[in-house]
Amino acid sequence: MTRNIDPIELAKALIAVPSVTPATGAVFDVLEAALTPLGFTVERFIDGIEPDGPVENLLAVRRGSGPKHFGFAGHLDVVPPGVGWTSDAFAPEIRGELLYGRGAVDMKGAIAAFVAAAAATPVDAGTISLIITGDEEGPAIFGTRALMEHMDARRVTPDMIVVGEPTSVNRLGDMVKIGRRGSVNIWIDVPGTQGHVAYPHLADNPIPKLVKILAAIDAVVLDEGSDWFQPSNIEFTDIEVGNGATNVIPASARARLSIRFNDQHRGAELVAMIERIAHEVEPAARVLGKISGEAFLTPPGELSELVAEAIHAETDICAEMSTTGGTSDARFLHALCPVVEFGLTNATMHKLDEAVAIEDLHRLTAIYRGILMRVFL
């Protein structure tokens, strides 16, 4: 037995509910109302506390008689719309061939497409899970990671997962993500002794020390890339001394840097490397690292092949398998099973007048259904 769900109408219903990260409440009501008639058992959880919570997460499972278990992961939270939209960001509007609204691309549209695809898939074909968080765009502390704990407690473990991130670049289907680089942010704090610039012998200026540290870091070449990854890179993102006076040597100097790294490195090793460099210049320097995620790769195989086949069948495009771009919740989910990311074109995500082509939503629905049928049959 199958049902028909219009992905356009469901996308509009989801977009119409403001859900700036972290998202809770009404937007999950809309999704639950769509899933329950399809035979899904829906559980919702409130995880975390301020300042990074509370976050709402949703796990929906429809068990079938087939042996395979397919998971779809996504997020209902969106980034703030900002000012300057042609129309209300949370009043979905179709103009021409495009559906406008915050989340149309990233990623309420993809969630709507997958629900429509699941509705068109026979209930007994196999087990389908939806793993949906309200915190992917924010700190992601109480989002998918917390949801995975609920999955573990319920012994919900898909054989494979597709994350509905907007991976396509120029045309729907031109790119699938099979991995992502890792990400670590590092803060360096060099202490000094405040004093008058006319009496430098009575002070200890931390700025020259910080400059030496940053120069040494800038000279580091982490690698030349690997089979599936581009070279790792270190980027300085902030330098600050908090000194508004022209005649005062500051008491401290701070810098922040971000490293995007491939599968040749681990986040903790990179933090330790930066700490060694800093301490060679100033033993009292303080270094703090925050790892957002490790690099991961799902080597080309069954999952990427069936996704590519479904894309080609609908679009006649041979999708590129890639690891470019920023981080996503796939960095957590890959610990469960093979994971790839595939969704809409990303040209307008996080931008004013975010929009998705109506045709692309229908095509994505067909591709997702093609993936499900290839998994289950």
UniProtKB/Swiss-Prot annotation:
Pfam families cross-referenced by the UniProt entry: M20_dimer, Peptidase_M20
Family matches, as PANTHER family: ACETYLORNITHINE DEACETYLASE (PTHR43808), N-ACETYL-L-CITRULLINE DEACETYLASE (PTHR43808:SF31)
Name this protein carries in UniProt: Succinyl-diaminopimelate desuccinylase
Family matches, as PROSITE patterns: ARGE_DAPE_CPG2_2
Cofactor(s) the protein requires to work: Zn(2+); Co(2+)
Catalytic residue list: 77, 136 (proton acceptor)
Record EC number: 3.5.1.18
Catalysed reactions, as listed in the record: N-succinyl-(2S,6S)-2,6-diaminopimelate + H2O = (2S,6S)-2,6-diaminopimelate + succinate
HAMAP family: DapE (MF_01690)
Classification via InterPro entries: ArgE/DapE_CS (IPR001261), Bact_exopeptidase_dim_dom (IPR036264), DapE_proteobac (IPR005941), Peptidase_M20 (IPR002933), Peptidase_M20_dimer (IPR011650), Peptidase_M20A (IPR050072)
